[in-house]
Amino acid sequence: MSITIKLGQLAEFLGATLRGDKDKDITGLAALQEAGPGQISFLAKSQYRKFLVDAQAAAVLLKPADADSYTGDALLVPDPYLAYARISHFFDPKPKGVAGVHPTAVIADDAQVDPAASIGAFVVIESGARIAAGVTIGAHSFIGARCEIGEGGWLAPRVTLYHDVRIGKHVVIQSGAVLGGEGFGFANEKGVWQKIAQIGGVTLGDDVEVGVNTAIDRGALADTRIGNGVKLDNQIQIAHNVQVGDHTAMAACVGISGSTKIGKHCMLAGGVGLVGHIDICDGVYITGMTMVTHSITEPGSYSSGTAMQPAAEWRKSAARLRKIDDMARRLQKLEKAVETVTCADNRSSDG
């Protein structure tokens, strides 16, 4: 797919201040050091300012404070990275679905599929499902009974929605994602695990994105709920009954145990793990590989574990950690000895 758009049109779309030729053709996007004629780029971080001198881009998105650093055509905006994000969709080569149903798709007689939806090859849509206008469902996807997909949703090939999954508007779900699988629920009877039926569903709000091979389990009783604007990276596990607040983002390999509640506008970096039945308040940032074992009630940044260091230093640190209990006992003895001597000295001076 190729697209050509005038620089002036981009300026109008962004509400940017245009400096240069409004009729210049823009045909693509590229990084500042790689952009060539016809491509627009951006300067978001000061360490890349050095590339402005030799930039070959047709135009650059700049903050007004950086305008004097570049003599070429530019669009001046408060946040160049955000502006780049907004115009990136003009140049997205992702194929657009064509309205209609592929002849190999299998659709239940009582399923409701809007004529403006695009249903790919070998898709299965079960009884009672409802597919809204503008939805694209990629090849070999499975939509279970009574599922609902809101307007403008985009499901890549090989997405699986078990029964009773409800999805809001403009949701993106990548290949291999499974929504509504059975939660991990068992009761122990004298050492034997008895399965608990998972009778809840999964509910996603509007503008949610779900990454490749991410799993969101159905609730045991009520639905597992993902709020509006939530962004989930690849290979994330969200267990039954979890609730995620609006506009929270999670990087790859996050694991969230059952019945945990995460607030709004939180960020969880890669590999974070959370135990079950805890609450995370709004506005929390959790750094990579952190293990969260209790509720967080105050906004802010949280970490656990040790950061990377040279292997030899790490081995020494690990060896010291094994001795920390012994070191603590020795320190307590020293403190008591010092306290005894101090008390004796005080008594002597008083006498």
From Swiss-Prot:
Name the chain's protein: UDP-3-O-acylglucosamine N-acyltransferase
- Supply the InterPro entries for this chain: Hexapep, Hexapep_transf_CS, LpxD, Trimer_LpxA-like_sf, UDP_GlcNAc_AcTrfase_non-rep
Q: What PANTHER family does this protein map onto?
A: UDP-3-O-ACYLGLUCOSAMINE N-ACYLTRANSFERASE (PTHR43378), UDP-3-O-ACYLGLUCOSAMINE N-ACYLTRANSFERASE 1, MITOCHONDRIAL-RELATED (PTHR43378:SF2)
UniProt enzyme class: transferase
The record, for PROSITE patterns, names:
HEXAPEP_TRANSFERASES
The biological pathway it contributes to is:
Bacterial outer membrane biogenesis; LPS lipid A biosynthesis
* Role this protein plays: Catalyzes the N-acylation of UDP-3-O-acylglucosamine using 3-hydroxyacyl-ACP as the acyl donor. Is involved in the biosynthesis of lipid A, a phosphorylated glycolipid that anchors the lipopolysaccharide to the outer membrane of the cell.
> What GO terms fall under cellular component here?
membrane
State the oligomer form and interacting partners.
Answer: Homotrimer.
Query: One Pfam family, short name please?
Result: LpxD
- State the family named in the UniProt similarity comment for this chain: Belongs to the transferase hexapeptide repeat family. LpxD subfamily.
Molecular-function annotations in GO: N-acyltransferase activity
Q: Which catalysed reactions does the entry list for this protein?
A: a UDP-3-O-[(3R)-3-hydroxyacyl]-alpha-D-glucosamine + a (3R)-hydroxyacyl-[ACP] = a UDP-2-N,3-O-bis[(3R)-3-hydroxyacyl]-alpha-D-glucosamine + holo-[ACP] + H(+)
Q: Which EC number(s) does the record attach to this protein?
A: 2.3.1.191
Q: Active site: which residues? A: 240
| Biological process per Gene Ontology, one example term | lipid A biosynthetic process
Question: NCBIfam families in the record, alphabetically?
Answer: lipid_A_lpxD, PRK00892.1
Protein source organism:
Pseudomonas savastanoi pv. phaseolicola (strain 1448A / Race 6)
Q: Which domain of life is it from?
A: Bacteria
Sorted alphabetically, which keywords does the UniProt record give? Acyltransferase, Lipid A biosynthesis, Lipid biosynthesis, Lipid metabolism, Repeat, Transferase
